[in-house]
Amino acid sequence: MDSPSHSREARVEKLKKIREQMRKSSHENRKEVVQEHSRMRIDPALERRLERKRMEAEEELAKIETEEEGGDFERRRAWDWTIEESEKWDQRLRKKKQTIQNVAFSDYHSQASKDYNRGIRDLKPDYEKYDKDKKEEKSKSRSVALYDEAERLDWVSNKPDKEHVERLVESIKKQDQRRLKNTKRRGTDEEDHITFINERNRKFNLKLQRFYSKYTKDIKEDLERGTAL
């Protein structure tokens, strides 16, 4: 068992390493900002990313220092941070968590729902043009009462604009690329037989397979031999 002095020395050494990493990270961040500034007069997304990294590093360091002193980090934050700073930081954490949940794969139903909403957002239907065309069709009719959209057949000869078709094709390509990227990240093949309903169930099935595959393999071979006979 480590002595208290040895344990404290280990924590101090860990704290020194973290501070050194922060110093190097800060130096690299400043160097990166200078390079980006000379290239394109500062990228707003880069500034936000670096600011987020800086705040996360400062919070992590404050947690470690507070634990070393035997204090409560939340109480220290309440003393050192203003209400506005604390609320802003909590909001950032919630937004970051929500973004991760939106991007991460949970199950195929939620994935299909996210793809549909993303597709609707990307396609952006032209409601003004739709209303304009509808009014023109109504004006062609002798009576508004005779205008029954359910009985119209002019949609058969309707041809969408070339721009809209290209946008749809581009959207489908992006969906295929995202699906391929997610498939590679999960380590699955699109042609594989799907035996799971979500990522958690897939990992559970793999664990079962590791422990019981030798038994199920024998049973499967026996069944195949019996079927062949």
Swiss-Prot record:
One of its GO terms (biological process) is mRNA cis splicing, via spliceosome. It is found in: Nucleus. The keyword Coiled coil applies. Pfam families: SYF2 (PF08231). GO terms for cellular component: catalytic step 2 spliceosome; post-mRNA release spliceosomal complex; Prp19 complex; spliceosomal complex; U2-type prespliceosome. Residues 115-140 have a biased composition (Basic and acidic residues). Residues 44-104 form a coiled coil. Keywords: Coiled coil, mRNA processing, mRNA splicing, Nucleus, Spliceosome. Residues 20-40, 106-142 are annotated as: Disordered. Belongs to the 40S cdc5-associated complex (or cwf complex), a spliceosome sub-complex reminiscent of a late-stage spliceosome composed of the U2, U5 and U6 snRNAs and at least brr2, cdc5, cwf2/prp3, cwf3/syf1, cwf4/syf3, cwf5/ecm2, spp42/cwf6, cwf7/spf27, cwf8, cwf9, cwf10, cwf11, cwf12, prp45/cwf13, cwf14, cwf15, cwf16, cwf17, cwf18, cwf19, cwf20, cwf21, cwf22, cwf23, cwf24, cwf25, cwf26, cyp7/cwf27, cwf28, cwf29/ist3, lea1, msl1, prp5/cwf1, prp10, prp12/sap130, prp17, prp22, sap61, sap62, sap114, sap145, slu7, smb1, smd1, smd3, smf1, smg1 and syf2. Involved in pre-mRNA splicing. This is Pre-mRNA-splicing factor syf2. The gene is syf2.
